[in-house]
Amino acid sequence: MFKTVREIILTSDAMSAILYPTVLVAEDSVDTRTMLKRAFELKGYGVFEAEDGRQALEIAKRHRPSLIVIDLNMPVLDGLETVRNYRRIEGEGVHTPIIAITAYDVYGMEEAALETGCNIYLSKPINLEELDRAVKSLGFLV
């Protein structure tokens, strides 16, 4: 009947994530990052950008985006290590959905991405319809 303050905050955060979703696009290629940014902005997402893994980790910790799309092969800190560190920071409980993207679709890469904590693995070049299906499969409305 009565909700605790914690329940109200969690409900508020969940509703905010649904109504005003944000995405962190972590990609070292300017062209790919720009394409992904525009695609998400057209669907109403607020977009944070990172060009390397260290930036991605800092932005993710600070802003807690609704979704992360991360290239697995980035400078400074690669995508797998970035995801591993972020999952450690998140701890138990609700985890931010993560879509891994890579041009290096070699044997074992998908398994490594999923074992590290990514929810979905996509190969480059990015097909926007496939990305859209992936995002929707994670429970996002757009």
Regions found by a protein language model. Give the residues of each.
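Non-catalytic signal-transmission and effector/linker regions of two-component phosphorelay proteins
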Residues: 1-24, 129-142
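Conserved acidic carboxylate
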Residues: 27
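Charged docking surfaces used in two-component/phosphorelay signaling
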Residues: 34-42
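Short hydrophobic/Thr-rich beta-strand motif most characteristic of the beta2 strand and flanking loop
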Residues: 44-51, 59
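Active-site beta3 strand of CheY-like receiver
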Residues: 63-69
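Receiver (REC) domain active-site loop signature in two-component systems and cognate sites
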Residues: 74
